[in-house]
Curated annotation (Swiss-Prot):
Gene name for this UniProt entry: Ap3m2
Localization (cell): Golgi apparatus; Cytoplasmic vesicle membrane
Family from the record: Belongs to the adaptor complexes medium subunit family.
Subunit and partners: Adaptor protein complex 3 (AP-3) is a heterotetramer composed of two large adaptins (delta-type subunit AP3D1 and beta-type subunit AP3B1 or AP3B2), a medium adaptin (mu-type subunit AP3M1 or AP3M2) and a small adaptin (sigma-type subunit APS1 or AP3S2). AP-3 associates with the BLOC-1 complex.
Keywords from the UniProt entry: Cytoplasmic vesicle, Golgi apparatus, Membrane, Protein transport, Transport
Domain MHD: 176-417
Membrane topology: Peripheral membrane protein
Summary of the function given for this chain in its UniProt record: Component of the adaptor complexes which link clathrin to receptors in coated vesicles. Clathrin-associated protein complexes are believed to interact with the cytoplasmic tails of membrane proteins, leading to their selection and concentration. Ap47 is a subunit of the plasma membrane adaptor. In concert with the BLOC-1 complex, AP-3 is required to target cargos into vesicles assembled at cell bodies for delivery into neurites and nerve terminals.
A GO CC term assigned to this protein in UniProt: axon cytoplasm
Name of the molecule in the record: AP-3 complex subunit mu-2
Organism annotation: Rattus norvegicus
GO BP, sorted A to Z: anterograde axonal transport; anterograde synaptic vesicle transport; endocytosis; intracellular protein transport; intracellular transport; neurotransmitter secretion; synaptic vesicle endocytosis
One Pfam short name: Adap_comp_sub
Amino acid sequence: MIHSLFLINSAGDIFLEKHWKSVVSRSVCDYFFEAQERATEAENVPPVIPTPHHYLLSVYRHKIFFVAVIQTEVPPLFVIEFLHRVVDTFQDYFGVCSEPVIKDNVVVVYEVLEEMLDNGFPLATESNILKELIKPPTILRTVVNTITGSTNVGDQLPTGQLSVVPWRRTGVKYTNNEAYFDVVEEIDAIIDKSGSTVTAEIQGVIDACVKLTGMPDLTLSFMNPRLLDDVSFHPCVRFKRWESERILSFIPPDGNFRLLSYHVSAQNLVAIPVYVKHSISFRDSGSLGRFEITVGPKQTMGKTIEGVTVTSQMPKGVLNMSLTPSQGTHTFDPVTKMLSWDVGKINPQKLPSLKGTMGLQVGASKPDENPTINLQFKIQQLAISGLKVNRLDMYGEKYKPFKGIKYMTKAGKFQVRT
C-alpha cells in the first residue's frame, strides 16, 4: 500500500525518507512542491495529489509535511489517519515532534517506522506495543547504546500483541494510581459585520493519561451525552455499550491516549464566547483612515478568557498604522500588511481596545472589502458545548485511584467580518 514516506520541512527540504518496497526517487516530490507553491498557506496544500504513476497523500503538522507515496488506489482517509498516527507516535516517544528532534533520534525513528508498517501495510500502531518493541530513547540508554553498540529494539515479544486487549501491556504496576481526562474543545466560527453568527461548530477531544496498576475496567458517563455528534473512538471503547446507554466502557491503554473525538454542529448548541466591536473606515481620496476594535467576553460562564491574539490582513493600500492599545502589544508589518495584537487576558471591567489611524497610499482607490479579524484565545475550565463528565467508575481492581477532569475551550478558525 504505502511505498515510501518523505518528511519535508516548511522550506521545502526533504530531511528524512523511508522506503518499504522499492525505492521511489525523490523527484516524485516535485509534484508536491508545485502544489505547495500554488497554495497560499501550508494548510491549503491538497491532501491528495495524483501523479502519472503515483498518488501523494500528505498531512501538515508541527511545520512538517508527512508525504506518503502509493501506487494503487486506496481510501485516502486510511492513509491520512495512519500519517496522523505516525506523528502522534513520534510525539509520544520524543515529547515533541519537530525536525531537530527527529534528526537527533533518526535511528529510533527508522526502527519505529519499520514496526508500524509491514511491507507497506499498517501493523503495530498502538503506542503501548511499540514501546515494548522499541524502547523510547533516554539519555542513559543513548549512552549505553553508544558504548555497547546495542539498539533500542526489545529482546522479547510484546505481551499485548498476543492479548485480547492488544492496546494494553500486561504486568503494569504503579505506586500512585491515577487517571486524568482533558476535555478540549476548539470552536470554529464566522461572525458577520452585525455580530450575528454565520456559521459555528465545535471540534472536541477527550485526551486521557491513565496510570493504573493491573487490568482496570473503566466506565465514564456524561451529564448530557446526546449533544455529541460524529464521534470517533479509541479501539478500547466498547461501541455497543455506547450505542445503547451512551456510556463509555473501556479497558484503557497505559499512559497517554486519545479516548474519543467528537463534533458539535448544531448552531443552537454553539455558544460564542467573545465579541468584537469594530470601526474601520477608508476614505475615498484622503491619506488617512480610522481603525478601532474592542474585544470583550460573552457567554463564558464567568470564566476568564486568556491568551487572546488578534490578527488582521490589511489591504495593500495601507502604508502604515499609528495605533494605541489599552493593553498588550501590537505590530504592523508594512511589507506583508499584517496587523498583530497580543492582548493577553481580558478583564471584563476594562475591555481591551486598539485604536488609531492608518496611513493610506495617496490616490489609491478605496478597498472593495474591509479586512477580516482573526482571533485566538483559550478559556480554562470550560467546555463551551456544555459537555460535563458525570462520573468515572473503575471495576476489576480493588485499589482506589485518584481521578481528575479538566476542561478547556480554545479558538480554531475564528473570524469576524468587518
